[in-house]
């Protein structure tokens, strides 16, 4: 297939800038770099014309960056964002449809250089990224001198909701979380303060049913949960979720599983009213002899329908001591509804492997993207960009049935990185010869009752191990009956027709 690749170098504020775009129909890989900046990507959205906007902030400060990409991946506009004596973090892009074209609101937590209390800057930009207005909102509800620890945003028809986590200037840890509501002009409508003992961390905000706002986070102590609020920020419900235990065989061993309290955990409410969660999975295995073992190398995509104590369906990776996987940093799950009233769910995770010779720090070895329906039935699961230091930050479901993955590329040890954007087609292809696309295995249904199937690859042999490491069965082909297995958690070691081996986690729950 014919592809196009071009490298263009030009001057921006007397600084050399390089970008590269490889494009073929819908799929592309675009990179952007500036030698004196280290861009940490925070958000991306699809525009009404099928293009994309990307935001990033300079890791070394004090500026931020906005990029506009065409539907083919060409960089049309790059816009630096700076303010005098202030460090700006472009965190979130929100689209605001206007009668005469599209406008966008960019929400930027900001730190004044004089050490005074943090502010929230609201930028309105037009479709060419020209700044239409700039407004600085004092965070008067913060304690004096407080800085931002984190910020999450959500837009509705008439207002913007924010979960703003503050830290005192003498500490690196959060001290309080403020839920705030602004109108689209940036006027503060109301706010509420939550202390860390009742709401420790906010992972994301999302639209819930009945015109409510959902908040997914750590509601303490060591419990992940979902809070819902009405439009006036009054608490409507509070549920602890995503924890369960399972006995392992007949020896008295048991395993406790819960969603990891991580910044990159995400929850969303799907059109059918169910919840989907993307997170790292923390596994704590307790042996009958008193010994215990903890592992958090796995990523889970789980669906909850009736209550929050056991997933209705889930996809769980399993990694041995040589690798670790974790979800995309700022948005690891997204979904879209198609014209046929279908819902398509995408999850993105980073796969890191540990080098040989006892070195501790893992290095990036690919981005894993999974596409499912809203029942988490997998359409495809693939690894991209095995070669190169690519770290996914955001995944966006796109209107054509595919997705866009954006993130940072470069040397994370030295904290020097550039921007990349990878457009994946609806069928899981990119269409570029230089981008390796590897099929990844998945197992379904999960939890299993009678029959389990291996998808994604042609399985030659599958070995099944219990949590104690004992092999309890093996089968050839892509399907097996598991009725003889006791309820519990099992590891599947799958060898495909290419001789490659992958490991997955399966739950048997009859």
Where are these regions (language model features)?
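Short glycine/acidic-enriched loop and turn motifs that connect beta-strands
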Residues: 59-62, 111-116, 167-173, 219-223, ...
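Blade-level signature of beta-propeller repeat domains, shared across WD40, Kelch, NHL, RCC1
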Residues: 391-431
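Short loop/turn motifs that cap or connect beta-strands within the blades
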Residues: 25-39, 75-89, 134-146, 188-200, ...
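Glycine-centered coil/turn sites that cap beta-strands in beta-rich domains
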Residues: 59, 433-463, 476-484
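Residue-level detector of functionally pivotal "anchor" positions at catalytic/ligand-binding pockets or at interdomain
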Residues: 424-444, 470-471, 509
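C-terminal tail/sorting-segment detector
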Residues: 487-510
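Residue-level detector of Asp-centered blade-edge/turn motifs that repeat once per structural unit
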Residues: 46-49, 95-101, 154-158, 207-210, ...
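Hydrophobic strand positions within the blades of repeat-based beta-sheet folds
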Residues: 44, 54-55, 66, 77, ...
